[in-house]
Regions:
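N-terminal glycine-rich anion-binding loops that anchor highly charged ligand groups
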Residues: 15-24, 49-51
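C-terminal helix-coil-helix/basic helical segment that borders enzyme active sites and/or dimer interfaces
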Residues: 28-36
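Short, contiguous pre-domain boundary segments
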Residues: 1-4
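A short, Trp-centered hydrophobic/proline-enriched beta-strand micro-motif
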Residues: 116-124, 168
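A short core secondary-structure module
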Residues: 150-184
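Internal helix-loop-helix
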Residues: 46, 50-117, 157-164
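A structural signal for short hydrophobic beta-strand segments in well-ordered beta-sheet cores
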Residues: 138-141
């Protein structure tokens, strides 16, 4: 398959490569030795990614994201993948699930994440169910204004200093013509 990059995609590739050379690669040895990204360094990387227009590139322009297409995101992810996930996770790609925010959730979660003011983590995968939502065991029950979560998650995405968590959990069971289905 021959994929010819547009001039815009070539510019994105050049921008990401320069960013990686200036902001990421110089810190690889330090991070490898420490076994983690120091918070100050992570926040510095995040701020530079925002300045470079790389932060939230995956989200639409109408919410303040970069509005990049799948080819651009593949180019970016390929370059990011040349370093440790611990480092490149600070460049920032808020989960597209935030686009499901409604009403006050937009101001509380979506827009601050797009601007880099908040970070989310995403917890779906479970030890026995993997990412099979219908096979998961984690439940959530309403308790006044709160939710009580019961269950286990692993392989959590975005755990670098999160401000909030998106946790996939069953909130009940509905009867359907095909049998009981978990309400998620």
């Amino acid at each position: 398959m021959d994929i010819t990059l547009s001039s815009e995609h070539e510019l994105i590739l050049k921008t990401v490569k320069r960013f990686m050379e200036e902001e990421i690669y110089p810190h690889e040895e330090e991070v490898d030795q420490l076994g983690e990204v120091p918070i100050e360094l992570g926040k510095q990387i995040e701020a530079r990614a925002i300045e470079a227009g790389l932060y939230s590139a995956n989200l639409p322009e109408f919410v303040g994201g970069g509005g990049q297409d799948y080819t651009a995101m593949a180019i970016m992810e390929r370059e990011y993948g040349k370093t440790s996930h611990a480092l490149h996770s600070w460049i920032g790609r808020p989960t597209e699930l935030l686009m499901a925010c409604q009403a006050d959730q937009v101001e509380r979660y979506l827009l601050p994440c797009v601007r880099g003011e908040k970070r989310e983590l995403f917890a779906l995968t479970e030890p026995e169910a993997g990412s099979d939502v219908m096979g998961m065991k984690t439940t959530a029950q309403r308790d006044g204004d709160d939710w009580i979560l019961n269950g286990s998650k692993h392989f959590i995405s975005g755990p670098c200093m999160p401000d909030f968590a998106i946790v996939v959990a069953a909130t009940g069971v509905d009867e359907t013509p095909r049998g009981p289905r978990k309400r998620v």
